[in-house]
From Swiss-Prot:
Assigned keywords, A-Z: Amino-acid biosynthesis, Cytoplasm, NADP, Oxidoreductase, Proline biosynthesis
Gene3D superfamilies, per the entry: Aldehyde Dehydrogenase, Chain A, domain 1, Aldehyde Dehydrogenase, Chain A, domain 2
One GO BP annotation of this record: L-proline biosynthetic process
Pathway(s) per entry: Amino-acid biosynthesis; L-proline biosynthesis; L-glutamate 5-semialdehyde from L-glutamate: step 2/2
Any one GO cellular component localisation term in the record: cytoplasm
GO MF: glutamate-5-semialdehyde dehydrogenase activity; NADP binding
Cytoplasm among keywords: yes
Protein name, UniProt field: Gamma-glutamyl phosphate reductase
Primary location class: cytoplasm
């Protein structure tokens, strides 16, 4: 790692902390005014941001970026407008800062309160996701945090244009623009420096593919909140309703293939496989999905006359693969127990869904599946901070400490204890 870059990034972290102390003093009304001003500015400068995104998109296409990543990189007028609306929604949400989590009196009269406070300085390392720049900025402002961003070279023009708009609004409203800053100018050395900057950055959040996330988890000296890759499953129980299951499956697999809440695996109970799989396979084939089927599923689908280039034999590697493409693994299971065991063995702990009408099966599945989100008779695509009503999200945490699932305002806070006394001393 370049020593000069490390020193510069540490200095940026310190400047962000100074800026954060100013933001922490702002009341809810002031933060909301700032957020609404940023939303308005994003709308006003949407043409400039979209033009910058076109530069990034053209280069990515020339470089051969795959369709899933290109979709995430896209930040056109429609998505900029949606991002601005997300900022306004964050402004409308209750302020978590100062919220009393719990409180009580000790026998000696000392009154204790646990209250929510900002974490401090966050670091965000992500790739080809320009919407994240807006989401993180809005959530940090509302929760009183500063942030250093490493948005990756693929979105460098888009992120630069977006951050210029945000910095201008911060300055015009009397805030230190260092509270939201980027290290993109330092390339990969900037990301490495962020991982080393313990004491200058309080927590690091990676968001991207499995390779990026694991590189940060393994190498960071700064505490990490791990956002997960999405090896996401749908299990169709023997009591599952095909009229529900097939639309859910097609939505979950094909609506946006390059996102972490897209379904990658389909498990089907043996009692319904013969009747369900031909219909499901026909729908998947019509949507252009390549099916990687185990032996039993392959036989059923082939017998139904859907054997073509879109049907291949699954390998052991398939069960652990997040495709982020028009591909899906299909397996027939003998029981609910087998489905749960398979999912808990191969899932990344993101989102799983059960399609069933039997309440006992639903209860068992939701209780035993060890993932951040479990859906019942619904698409896995709903696992999203915006859909959950958070306005925006930092990512979807698949770890169990501090945060799990979509991370919104509350997940960007920590707590401290305040003791109110009248002269008490400990005996």
């Amino acid at each position: 790692m370049n020593a000069d870059v490390f020193e510069a990034v540490c200095a940026m972290g310190d400047a962000a902390r100074t800026a954060q102390s100013q933001l922490a003093q702002a009341n809810t009304e002031a933060k909301n005014q700032l957020l609404n001003a940023i939303a308005d500015a994003l709308d006003q400068h949407a043409d400039d941001i979209a033009a910058a995104n076109t530069l990034d998109m053209n280069k990515a296409e020339t470089d051969g970026m795959d369709a899933g990543k290109l979709d995430r990189l896209k930040f056109d007028q429609q998505r900029i407008t949606a991002a601005a609306q997300g900022v306004r929604h964050v402004a409308s949400l209750p302020d978590p800062i100062g919220e009393i989590v719990r409180g009580y009196h000790l026998e000696n009269g000392l009154r204790l309160q646990q209250v929510r406070v900002p974490i401090g300085v966050l670091g965000m390392i992500y790739e080809a996701r320009p919407n994240v720049t807006v989401d993180v900025a809005s959530l940090c402002i509302k929760s009183g945090n500063a942030v250093l961003l490493r948005g990756g070279h693929a979105a460098e023009h888009t992120n630069a244009a977006t951050l210029a708009v945000i910095a201008d609004v911060l300055t015009k409203h009397g805030y230190d623009h260092n509270m939201i800053a980027t290290v993109d100018q330092y390339g990969r050395d900037g990301a490495t420096a962020m991982m080393e900057a313990r004491g200058h950055i309080d927590v690091l959040i990676p968001r991207g593919g499995a390779g990026l996330i694991q590189a940060v988890v393994r190498n960071s000296k700064v505490p990490v909140i791990e956002t997960g890759a999405g090896n996401v499953h749908i299990y169709v129980d023997r009591t599952g309703n095909p009229d529900k299951a097939i639309p859910i499956l097609i939505n979950a697999k094909t609506q946006r293939v390059g996102v972490c809440n897209a379904t990658e695996k389909l498990l089907v109970h043996k009692d319904i496989a013969e009747s369900f799989l031909p219909k499901a396979a026909a729908a998947l084939a019509a949507a252009g999905v390549e099916m990687h089927a185990d032996e039993r599923a392959y036989g059923i689908i082939e017998h139904a006359g859907i054997a073509n280039a879109q049907l291949v034999h699954a390998t052991d590697e398939d069960w652990d693969t997040e495709y982020l493409a028009l591909k899906i693994g299909i397996k027939v299971v003998d029981s609910l127990d087998e489905a749960i065991a398979h999912i808990n063995r191969h899932s990344t702990g993101h989102t799983e869904s059960i399609i069933a009408e039997d309440y006992s099966a639903i209860e068992e599945f939701t209780a035993r599946i060890d993932s951040a989100v479990v859906m019942v008779n619904a698409s896995t695509r709903f696992t999203d901070g915006g859909v959950f009503g958070f306005g925006a999200e930092l990512g979807i945490s698949t770890q169990k400490m501090h945060a799990r699932g979509p991370m919104g305002l509350h997940e960007m806070t920590t707590t401290k204890w305040i003791g109110y006394g009248t002269g008490q001393v400990r005996e």
